[in-house]
Amino acid sequence: MKFSQAVIALAAATVVSAQLPDVPQCSLPCFLDALTTDGCSELTDFKCHCSKPELPAKITPCVKSKCPVAEQVSVSNAVVKQCSEAGAPVSIPPVEESSSKPSEPSTSEAPTASPTESTPAPTTPAPTGTGSPSGTGAPGGPSGTGTFTNTGVPTQSTPIYTGAASGLSANIGGMGAAILAIAAYL
């Protein structure tokens, strides 16, 4: 019995991953649970899933507990896109930066604390110096004299571009989720 449940979970995780390739791996268990228990007859019937008003309310807390904020935004965008393409647009509240606890209702009361001034931290000037090279080089190697001046101004390096390979991790992640689903049911 457990083996058949594992096979079903694997198939469902694979379908969810294939249908929602932009969804981060951390959220796949949330979708798997929500999409297999919402009463829709097929896992890939996103028009049915998206028409269920409880879908965002069921997936959101799970995603908040399993994914970092950046990936929560990706999940939100993917759900809105998938539901719109299926013909059943949904509205999902924006992801809050501090997702470690549930948001509390806002009030119209005035703030109780007043702004304070802060003193900037003292700065230490960057060291500068001049120097002359000394020593001898290898025979036949470069030679000469010169000076070195340190301006104390740091330079910024260019960030690494991951290119199209960054999208590959989402598809590979789906297989990882499928394997985890099998392990959970065994």
Curated annotation (Swiss-Prot):
Coiled coil: none annotated. Residues 164-186 form a propeptide. One of its GO terms (molecular function) is metal ion binding. GPI-anchored cell wall protein involved in stabilizing the cell wall. Residues 148-159 have a biased composition (Polar residues). Heme binds at residue 45. It comes from Arthroderma benhamiae (strain ATCC MYA-4681 / CBS 112371) (Trichophyton mentagrophytes). The GPI-anchor is attached to the protein in the endoplasmic reticulum and serves to target the protein to the cell surface. There, the glucosamine-inositol phospholipid moiety is cleaved off and the GPI-modified mannoprotein is covalently attached via its lipidless GPI glycan remnant to the 1,6-beta-glucan of the outer cell wall layer. It comes from the Eukaryota. Residues 1-18 form the signal peptide. It is found in: Secreted; Secreted, Cell wall; Cell membrane. Pfam families: CFEM. Keywords: Cell membrane, Cell wall, Disulfide bond, Glycoprotein, GPI-anchor, Heme, Iron, Lipoprotein, Membrane, Metal-binding, Secreted, Signal. InterPro entries: CFEM_domain (IPR051735), Extracellular_membr_CFEM_dom (IPR008427). Belongs to the RBT5 family. Residues 96-131 have a biased composition (Low complexity). Residues 19-108 form the CFEM domain. One of its GO terms (cellular component) is extracellular region. A lipid is attached at residue 163 (GPI-anchor amidated glycine). Residues 89-159 are annotated as: Disordered. It is a lipid-anchor; GPI-anchor. Residues 132-144 have a biased composition (Gly residues). SMART domains: CFEM. Disulfide bonds join 26-67, 30-62, 40-48, 50-83. The CFEM domain is involved in heme-binding and contains 8 cysteines and is found in proteins from several pathogenic fungi, including both human and plant pathogens. The CFEM domain adopts a novel helical-basket fold that consists of six alpha-helices, and is uniquely stabilized by four disulfide bonds formed by its 8 signature cysteines. This is GPI-anchored hemophore ARB_02741.
